[in-house]
């Protein structure tokens, strides 16, 4: 058997080793930085800007988090007093007036409001429970730094007073924690950031143009009460824009969760390390993210325009005792602080009227309205921001221009007689000879090439969900590795089988054409959602579609390098004539399509010119003579790869690299961060009752999108990488099916509450969590020994099992028996206890924390850790 030896001088040729090495380098060169950006927080500077002190902020965070401080606790009152003292210390340390005047500015007036008077009653539709009503008395701390364009009067002291200056800026954080968490990230970092903002904007050189209101609200963890009651304070009429600082994880980077519009998002571009995507905002808009922050009060109820910046992972530490300073860092503090300073400085220095206008909610502030925005970061260092209607215009343009460009190119190819696509044969100039082109070969590969790996990865999602549904909680990258390895190996295997059975030089162009059609349909869907529902999360589809269009167009332009079909037919007839030696025509064939239809099984001597001539593996042309006399002439062209069509010698050998660079990098850069952000956000939501299948299917979808750019080139891969990935797949599959899903660094949260019926004396401690783990943990507690642990499905937390046993009686406090006369009334009085700072007060909870396995954590299951309940009935006085 003769072997084909292609020239090795060109390291960019479309051959196996260049394709394997270059594609691997491109993917690794992008995936590694994306992973680093996602997991590594930029270092805090050794010398921060004037007016900021990171060491001071870290010391404040340590004080703030040295105990649980929910709204309903003594520790919360201690933090309230400490905040007032720290604010006064910062203000007392400001320099004299002369230092401000040296910088051509006035020292700003600062007003501190210890708001223990505002109160609010909310009920019905404003809360999650339509049957619930809440009366709340606030203990917010408000700092107002007067802008040098603000009114100089104390307008807030006048009855119904309103500011006459342009709207100010609100920066919000909450200083209460949950009863089971120290609140370092939720929301201690936000609180110390606000303290540093007070310091920064009272430092010479940073006096604000617009008034700045810094709010330390108390009561966010219970119905967002702190933000609600802030709306009752007169100073709430001043701000038109806001920045909300929040935490839903422990450490890491602070991401831009959402923003109200294009104009208010602009100042965030000043952040030295921007991070986030508008896709997360769409998650809130569509209801996929059910939890809320104070953002919804400021933007939805009060009509302000602003941004929501928050920490978002890992969720396993959220609202637990691992939300402490040990599990965050100064770098995380700096990441939020630097973003807050940049954004706030941009908002308070704005000199336009774009944040003033008609209220956009009933009774809201006159903040006007803005344009819908598209925004995302690039490698955590650059922030891209443009308006949604710009995305719509770009999508519509590309949807029209792309098909027309390919159509006109196809027409030009047809006129030049170089349209080999979909052509099974060609005729010579005298139209007497018909030679096969095999131009349809490879067209029907893509549905199998794309479909089989995708279906298998989705099937793996269902398999893991069935066998070990929560392994993603602690081993998300094992799931990623399994999906990626399976997808690449199957795509390579299918492509190699197809290439062996039907070798085709058109594999690349047909695959890109199919990809273009799919991306075009996706772009249509993204356009419809952007126009009708204002959802901008499909922005990545535009870039994905644009790259595929250009790569596809390049493949069509490559066809101009081919000889015309007539010229090619003449060349083959000339070769056939010389080989026969007697001028007879050889190898004439019908014009029937031989692309994907049944034909002679290809072997080393499969016919090149149909039934008359045969070619060896090395592209020999063998011409048979009459009466078994054989005359043979060898025609070898090293520019033809393998057993592909002979006319492919003229195709460029380097353009594949350009096509790879147009498809793979842009896909990874656009989709990679979304994949990491999305899976980080949802991989641990199963413990909250979310269905785990969603996370696995999401990984399968992201895997398919990010690896699809490999399909036009994967048939050129050597076997080394796919076989290695096959081994990775088998190993990770076994691990994902049998490994225990939780660990001490990725614990399972169990929701705890203790209920005491003061009439009957029934004392019930309850854990709610995933089955069967919650039952196993409950039965192992000493107080549950010898008892029958009662388990039933939770009525409010879907997919969670609630297990109860007779707990150790709480010893919160001794009290008296106040009496009051009412009219006819009956119901239940419920008292809550949330303070768990003193051992022995809640012995059942102390026991649970002490004896829980290392892979489980306690979090609050209700507003109180203990709920004391007593029925009452008061008759009529008469």
UniProtKB/Swiss-Prot annotation:
One of its GO terms (cellular component) is vacuolar membrane. It is found in: Vacuole membrane. It is a multi-pass membrane protein. Residues 591-603 have a biased composition (Acidic residues). The keyword Zinc applies. InterPro entries: Fxna-like_M28_dom, M28_fam, Peptidase_M28, PFF1_C, PFF1_TM. The active site is at residue 220. It is an enzyme of class 3 (hydrolase). Belongs to the peptidase M28 family. This is Vacuolar membrane protease.
């Amino acid at each position: 058997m003769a072997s084909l030896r292609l020239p090795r001088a060109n390291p960019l040729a479309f051959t196996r080793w260049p394709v394997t090495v270059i594609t691997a380098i491109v993917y690794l060169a992008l995936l590694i930085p994306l992973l680093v950006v996602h997991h590594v927080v930029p270092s805090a500077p050794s010398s921060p800007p004037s007016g900021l002190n990171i060491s001071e902020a870290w010391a404040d965070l340590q004080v703030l988090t040295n105990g649980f401080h929910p709204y309903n606790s003594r520790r919360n009152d201690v933090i309230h007093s400490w905040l007032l003292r720290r604010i006064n210390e910062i203000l007392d340390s400001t320099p004299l007036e002369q230092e401000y005047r040296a910088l051509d500015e006035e020292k700003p007036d600062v007003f501190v409001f210890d708001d223990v008077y505002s109160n609010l009653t909310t009920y019905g539709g404003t809360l999650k429970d339509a049957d619930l009503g809440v009366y709340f008395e606030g203990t917010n701390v408000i700092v107002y730094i007067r802008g040098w364009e603000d009114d100089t009067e104390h307008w807030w002291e006048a009855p119904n007073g309103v500011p006459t200056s342009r709207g100010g800026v609100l920066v919000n954080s909450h200083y209460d924690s949950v009863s089971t968490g120290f609140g370092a990230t939720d929301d201690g970092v936000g609180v110390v950031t606000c303290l540093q903002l007070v310091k920064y904007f009272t430092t010479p050189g940073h006096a604000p143009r617009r008034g700045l209101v810094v709010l330390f609200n108390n009561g966010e963890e219970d119905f967002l009460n702190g933000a609600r009651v802030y709306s009752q304070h007169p100073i709430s009429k001043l701000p038109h824009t806001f920045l909300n600082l929040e935490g839903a994880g422990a450490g890491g980077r602070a991401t831009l969760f959402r923003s109200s519009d294009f104009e208010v998002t602009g100042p965030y571009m000043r952040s030295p390390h921007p991070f986030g995507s508008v896709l997360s905002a769409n998650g809130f808009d569509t209801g996929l993210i059910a939890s809320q922050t104070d953002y919804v009060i400021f933007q939805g109820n009060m009509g302000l325009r602003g941004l929501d910046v928050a920490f978002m992972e890992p969720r396993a530490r959220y609202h637990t005792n691992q939300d402490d300073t040990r599990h965050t860092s100064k770098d995380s503090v700096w990441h939020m602080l630097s973003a807050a300073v940049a954004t706030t400085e941009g908002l308070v220095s704005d000199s336009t009227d774009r944040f003033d206008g008609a209220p956009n909610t009933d009774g809201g502030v006159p903040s006007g309205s803005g344009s819908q925005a598209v925004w995302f970061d690039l490698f955590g260092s650059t922030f891209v921001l443009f308006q949604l209607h710009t995305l719509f215009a770009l999508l519509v343009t590309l949807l029209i221009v792309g098909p027309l460009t390919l159509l006109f190119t196809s027409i030009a190819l047809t006129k030049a007689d170089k349209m080999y696509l979909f052509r099974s044969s060609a005729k010579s100039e005298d139209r007497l000879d018909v030679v096969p082109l095999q131009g349809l070969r490879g067209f029907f590969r893509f549905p199998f090439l794309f479909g089989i790996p995708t279906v298998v990865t989705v099937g793996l999602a269902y398999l893991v969900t069935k066998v070990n549904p929560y392994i993603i909680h602690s081993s998300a990258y094992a799931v990623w590795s399994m999906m990626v390895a399976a997808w690449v190996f199957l795509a390579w295997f299918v492509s190699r089988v197809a290439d062996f059975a039907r070798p085709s030089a058109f594999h690349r162009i047909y695959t890109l054409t199919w990809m273009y059609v799919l991306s075009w349909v996706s772009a249509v869907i993204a356009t419809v959602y952007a126009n009708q529902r204002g959802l901008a999360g499909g922005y990545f589809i535009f870039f994905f579609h644009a790259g595929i269009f250009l790569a596809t167009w390049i493949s069509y332009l490559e066809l101009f390098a081919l000889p015309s079909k007539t010229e090619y037919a003449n060349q083959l007839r000339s070769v056939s004539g010389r080989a026969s030696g007697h001028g007879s025509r050889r190898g004439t064939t019908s014009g029937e399509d031989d692309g994907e239809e049944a034909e002679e099984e290809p072997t080393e001597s499969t016919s090149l010119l149909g039934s008359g001539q045969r070619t060896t593996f090395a592209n020999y042309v063998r011409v048979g003579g009459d009466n078994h006399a054989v005359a043979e002439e060898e025609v070898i062209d090293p520019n033809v790869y393998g057993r592909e069509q002979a006319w492919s010698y003229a195709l460029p050998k380097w353009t594949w690299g350009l096509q790879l660079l147009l498809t793979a990098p842009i896909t990874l850069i656009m989709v990679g961060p979304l994949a990491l952000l999305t899976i980080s956000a949802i991989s641990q939501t199963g413990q909250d009752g979310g269905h785990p299948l969603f996370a696995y299917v999401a990984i399968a979808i992201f895997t398919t999108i990010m690896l699809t750019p490999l399909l036009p080139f994967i048939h050129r891969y050597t076997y080394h990488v796919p076989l290695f990935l096959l081994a990775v797949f088998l190993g990770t599959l076994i691990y994902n099916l049998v490994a225990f899903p939780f660990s001490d660094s990725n614990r399972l949260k169990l929701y705890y509450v203790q209920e005491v019926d003061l009439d009957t004396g029934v004392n019930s401690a309850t854990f709610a969590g995933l089955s069967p783990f919650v039952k196993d943990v409950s039965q192992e507690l000493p107080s549950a020994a010898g008892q029958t642990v009662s388990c039933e499905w939770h009525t409010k937390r879907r997919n969670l099992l609630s297990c109860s046993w007779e707990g150790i009686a709480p010893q919160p406090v001794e009290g008296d028996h106040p009496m009051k006369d009412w009219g006819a009334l009956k119901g239940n009085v419920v008292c809550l206890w949330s303070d768990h700072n003193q051992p022995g007060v809640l012995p059942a909870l102390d026991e649970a924390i002490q004896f829980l396995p290392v892979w489980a954590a306690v979090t609050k299951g209700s507003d109180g850790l203990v709920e004391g309940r007593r029925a009452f009935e008061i008759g009529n006085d008469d």
